[in-house]
């Protein structure tokens, strides 16, 4: 048997040299990899059993010095049977092309990777790319067949520079290449595609590739802690080298894997092949079903270390952690705005592009997100999937339910940094912040009136334009405000009222009737810790506790006045808007509150539904009955701190305090005269107008005050309601009784 052909290889055939300029460009990990690969190549040649001297390259590396090649490095001419190539043919460093030699030793260039021309041919290539990179040799010996005839590799003479970092000096030393090695060519060799290292045994190549995988894991940290990190990394590297061969015929989107294309096509077909066995909800992907099942099982395996909040998915926890860190990794390329979530940036990009691909089939309105379209469609279907567990009220949006629940819990998470006042809604805090700076950002273009809220300004503008955008669905009548429409619809709702079976009281809504039925039950589970009073609902207890604490959380954005209850603030805001939606059908007088209209209607009907159980006297107003009952009991709970005088009603005490303070808030517009009591101003205005609204039905005489008319009627009837306790004498007027009592007071000292 003939001996196999051999090829002569030197160490420089598998070595790589850098200039000083190139060495500084390399990163630290690249320098380490370079040194490791050079040592490995040397050890591979040494392991073949041939004796040769250790190259200076390896010696300097062991001494910790950098190996640099000078600019004057050159290649020796090739010793072959044919004519050697010229210097012009070898000097390819500025061409950026590949330098190759064919069988006859003739050099030639190629734009692409070198390939073998046949089983008996071998190209030895040197990749010399770019003007800056002066890599003089990067060759790998490649073995093809046993019949390969003997060739000689380029014998090189290179000028090497040894650079010692400590001494900072350069020493130029011309070096001859070490002796050649006769390496027999095997039947097949295996080359590493990363570093071009050659192996004769395949398992050695596989073992060698693991070292690259470890180094790659350091470069790609997201694969480092995964149990399948290495396999995923190899798969990722393989995909990066491939093309996206699998294209969707519907949207022309391309994928690396056929399975990814099949998964994507489910979006176009609308298939949801994975149903949930618990709630019959269907999903496109099995992974989404698995995540959904965690909700039924109550599993939340991913917990936040900062606040303890748990999540179903790892990605949800990752997004949540950005709240604590403040990280916003997704930046808009148009305006440099940053976002915490990628989907937030995608929605933002539609503002730049103006694209709104999701259209409502009912009204034609467009949206940038599919979720926003689904939420909008609930307004057409009147679907309200989010209901309150306390009062049963339903909402279209989840965020509205969250805001409503704070009414029951009393939670106020938004605090003002200036005055530490807390608010239930974030928009209320924003409006409150404008009060500190005195800014009313929304101004009416007609009258320049300022508003804290845009909605308040729009409602105000309808007064100028006489626009009435709120029509009644029953009769078609239009209104400027939704509150006026709501009051009007009550006229139609009287035919659709829900009566209470216990007290025959009727309600316009079923939910109101449900709440009212709790009145007839004796259960009151919510008790006040201060006074022990019990309530049927937690919300009522929350409102009651504000009486003890003096808290007034609802502030009017117009005048800064505060209220304990939201309903009181809403009624107060109607005064600013000059809104009086409740009108009397008899005299066309309007009122802010429904209760005011109800009390007014009793003037026309003469109804007095409140009767005193002591004297059977009847009253038109419930407040008047309460004040009257205090006269029977002799109780006067409202006392003046100045003089100790007591009153049966709060407003009487308020009027009395003005006597001490000298305050006269009610001023006549005609003569600038001021009064402590509003009723006194009304009587005074009758003098200017000459009107006497209270007339006697017997003689037609008119009076300014109602009590004057009552006293006058006693003259016709002969009644003397005011009697003296001392002598029993009776009088028509209370003033006459007081004068008479003074007479008795003067007589008592004289008798002594």
From Swiss-Prot:
Entries under Pfam families matching the protein: KRAB, zf-C2H2
Major location (coarse): nucleus
Coiled coil segments of this chain: none
Annotated compartments: Nucleus; Cytoplasm
Stored CDD domains: KRAB_A-box
Disulphide-bridged cysteine pairs: none
Keywords: Cytoplasm, DNA-binding, Metal-binding, Nucleus, Repeat, Transcription, Transcription regulation, Zinc, Zinc-finger
The KRAB domain, residue ranges: 9-80
GO cellular component, one term: nucleus
Zinc finger boundaries on the chain: C2H2-type: 190-212, 246-268, 274-296, 302-324, 330-352, 358-380, 386-408, 414-436, 442-464, 470-492, 498-520, 526-548, 554-576, 582-604, 610-632, 638-660, 666-688, 694-716, 722-744
A single GO BP: negative regulation of DNA-templated transcription
GO molecular function: DNA-binding transcription factor activity, RNA polymerase II-specific; RNA polymerase II transcription regulatory region sequence-specific DNA binding; zinc ion binding
Family: Belongs to the krueppel C2H2-type zinc-finger protein family.
Domain comment, as recorded: The C2H2 domain is necessary for the transcriptional repression.
Described purpose of this protein according to its UniProt entry: Acts as a transcriptional repressor.
Protein's recorded name: Zinc finger protein 425
